[in-house]
Structure formats: C-alpha cells, structure tokens
C-alpha cells in the first residue's frame, strides 16, 4: 500500500510540475537568421535590439538549447535526453524573438512562426519543410530564394528584385509582392496564390500543382505538365511563351503575343486580343478563347 501511495504521489507531483510554466531569457551573440524545428511556436518582432526568450513547462525548459553559430540563431529541443513521460506530454514551446535584420529562416517539423514588422536584407533565404506554418513575413530584398515542402503553409509579402520559389508536396504558399524577375517551380500537389507585378515571370509546374496569379508582367513563360493547373486569367502579360503537356490546364490574359506548344490532352485558354505568333498543337490538345 505504501509503495502504491508513494507511486501515486510521485505521479501527481510530476503532473503538477508539467503544468508549471516558466519564462527564460538567453544571452546570445548577434544573429540575423533563425533555425528551428519540432514544436517551437515563434513570435518574431522587428526591433533595434536582438533578444530571445522561451516560455515552456518547467521540466521541459532544461532540455531547450538556444545557440548562435555564424549569425544563425538555433532553437532545439534535446529529445534524446528527455524522459519518456515528458516526450508524451510535450506541448508547443513558445519562443519570443526580436531582431533588427532577418536574412535566413529555416523551419522544419511542426514549427510555427508569426512575424510582425518589415525586414530589408540584401539577400534572403527561406526553407520551410514538414508541417510548418509561417505567416506575417514581410521581406524587401535584392535576391531571394524560398523553398516550401511537405504540408507547410507559408505567407510572404514585400518587394524583391529577383526571387525564386520552389514548392512541392502538399504545401500551400501565399505571396503578395512586387518583383523584377520571379521564378516559380512547383511539383506534387502544392498550391500557390501570387498577387503582384513583375517585369519577368517564369512559372514551371508539374504533377497536380495548382497556381493562381493576379497582377501583371511584361513578359512571361508558362510551363505546365501532368495534371497541373495554372490560372493566370487575371495576370495580364504583354508577351507570353507557353508549353503545356499531359492533361494540364492553363488560363492566360495577353495583350501582345502568344507562342505556344500544346500537347497531350492539355488545354490553353486565353483572354485578350493577342497575336498568335508560333503555335503548335498535337494529340487532343486545344487552344480556346475565354468568352
């Protein structure tokens, strides 16, 4: 009986301690990037001074590792050293980060990020994988490269000179910005909604990717294969080159010229009064005007 009571008391104390939250602040060197995975829920704020703090259960706090290497802030949870009971009862760890400049974001696992404030790095790199959720990012940069994979959901606004997006898996990406040159590569069952203006737009998608564009570009190149869908009816371009294969579907709005190579069971639908420059169709492919 005493052993049972002792065991129950120990269990009660352990559960009670799991419910206690503590806040910890960390003294770290200057950083301009963030790397986090697992179950970190990050609130990012633009500030003139850098700071980092976490809020978590008291027993879990000792397993949180915060470090900076080559200007990259790393948030990590040492699950290898954690007792099994802690692993089973671990909830999201809240992290509060303030920084003056942001040029890199690498998130994985089930990490979350909510950002406020605009950042102006010369270059920006973003990598979001797993089941990441990131929104509120406002980036203004000369050069940018963003990769989104898995079941991640990412929202980015701002202004870029040259920007490249690679989306895959079942990821969902929402973009709102101006750019000089935008490149998008999509595969799997990924989805993207883009709103903005660009001088040059190059979109290449495959699989069951779905991309919707709103805004305008001077020149554009659209390539779609598999069962992908590219809806650019409300994305007005002057001149466009199009290549469609498989059973892909492309909608476009053109004021200047269209050059197109359409094959398989793919369909090209267009709005506007463009000049048909170089047109090739084969198999069951078709070109139709949007009425």
Where are these regions (language model features)?
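Positively charged n-region of N-terminal signal peptides that target proteins for export
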Residues: 1-4
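Acidic (Asp/Glu) and glycine-rich low-complexity loops/linkers
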Residues: 6, 18-129, 135-149, 153-166, ...
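Hydrophobic h-region of N-terminal signal peptides that target proteins for export
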Residues: 10-18
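Short, surface-exposed interaction patches in beta-rich subdomains
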Residues: 156-158, 173-185, 189-291
């Amino acid at each position: 009986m005493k052993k049972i009571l002792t065991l129950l008391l120990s269990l009660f104390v352990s559960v009670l301690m799991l419910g206690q939250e503590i806040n910890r602040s960390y003294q770290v060197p200057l950083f301009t990037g963030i790397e986090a995975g697992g179950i970190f829920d990050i609130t990012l704020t633009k500030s003139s001074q850098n700071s980092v703090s976490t809020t978590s259960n008291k027993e879990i706090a000792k397993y949180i590792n915060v470090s900076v290497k080559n200007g990259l802030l790393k948030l990590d949870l040492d699950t290898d050293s954690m007792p099994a009971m802690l692993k089973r009862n671990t909830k999201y760890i809240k992290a509060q980060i303030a920084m003056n400049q942001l040029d890199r974001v690498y998130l994985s696992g089930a990490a979350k990020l909510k950002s406020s404030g605009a950042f102006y790095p010369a270059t920006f790199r973003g990598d979001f994988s797993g089941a990441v959720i990131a929104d509120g990012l406002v980036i203004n940069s000369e050069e940018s490269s963003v990769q989104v994979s898995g079941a991640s959901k990412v929202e980015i606004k701002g202004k870029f000179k040259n920007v490249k997006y690679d989306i895959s898996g079942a990821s969902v990406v929402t973009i709102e910005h101006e750019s000089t040159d935008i490149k998008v590569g999509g595969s799997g069952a990924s989805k993207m909604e883009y709103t903005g203006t660009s001088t040059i737009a190059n979109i290449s998608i495959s699989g069951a990717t779905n991309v919707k564009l709103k805004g305008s570009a001077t020149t554009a190149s659209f390539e779609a294969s598999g069962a992908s869908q590219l809806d650019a009816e409300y994305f007005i371009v002057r001149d466009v080159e199009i290549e469609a294969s498989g059973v892909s579907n492309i909608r476009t709005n053109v004021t200047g010229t269209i050059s197109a190579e359409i094959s398989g069971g793919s369909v090209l639908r267009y709005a506007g009064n463009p000049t048909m420059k170089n047109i090739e169709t084969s198999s069951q492919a078709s070109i139709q005007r949007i009425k």
